[in-house]
Amino acid sequence: MQRFLFIIRDDLTKLEKMTNQERYSRCVEEQLAWIKSLADAGLHLQGEPLAIKGRLVRKDQVIADGPFIDAKEGIAGFDVILAENLDQAAEIALTCPLVRNEISIIEVRPIDGLIQLNQALNEVKK
């Protein structure tokens, strides 16, 4: 099994329009149940929601406040899951209530451990 990072990106305009507290609460409950089902299956390793605002630090030490992707989109959180391959990880992401309810999109990235990084560097050196 490999580790995969789910970068959860929210459409901030949709969140602003979600004034129905009952619908919001239902979405949160569905998300928590989804995470629990993954954890019970041994597939969910870690995850956290993120604040909308943050700081971007560059080499020249210029610090900017954000969100940084787009004015309409922000990174809402992340999850680390286990899957056999990228296809299976993407299939798991499709089951996320935030995706099904068209609140979020999930970017799925394999997490390359240091072993894989060292192997890749050795290949480049050849």
Model region roles, listed by residue range:
Residues 1-126:
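Conserved, structured core segments of small domains
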